Amino acid sequence: MQIWVDADACPKVVKEVLFRAATRTGIKLTLVANHYIPVPSAANIRSMQVEAGFDVADDEIVKRSEAGDLVISADIPLAAELIEKKVQVLNPRGELYTEATIKARLNIRDFMDTMRASGIQTGGPAPLSQTERREFANQLDRILAKAKI
């Protein structure tokens, strides 16, 4: 198992939790982004810069991830594609996407896209709360413990 991060929009606090977990457990952690992302100096932590462009980082994650890996991303279509490959997907708010929940999340996302396209202002996501940060860290710990890392 290794952890892949859709790092372009990943909050700094989430990256810090991931760096601590990777340092503590030795799990391989790769941040994928279309710009340089600084990472701690450790053999198991790296940053992968891809070309700028729509979904280039997402496509790289799909290509490189394997069944049993963990991807950190809030990108719902990416999560759906990864779940089909039996990759676990955890969003930065601590929600683990599953086969049972991803279809509903895709429907909500598509509905919001339709509203935005019709000119309705929907706003963006709220900043991460302390509760969500804690939930992310707890969920990550549960996943790593289950994998016995």
Curated annotation (Swiss-Prot):
It holds the Pfam family DUF188. InterPro entries: UPF0178. It comes from the Bacteria. PANTHER family: UPF0178 PROTEIN YAII. Belongs to the UPF0178 family. It comes from Aliivibrio fischeri (strain MJ11) (Vibrio fischeri). CDD domains: PIN_YqxD-like. This is UPF0178 protein VFMJ11_0615.
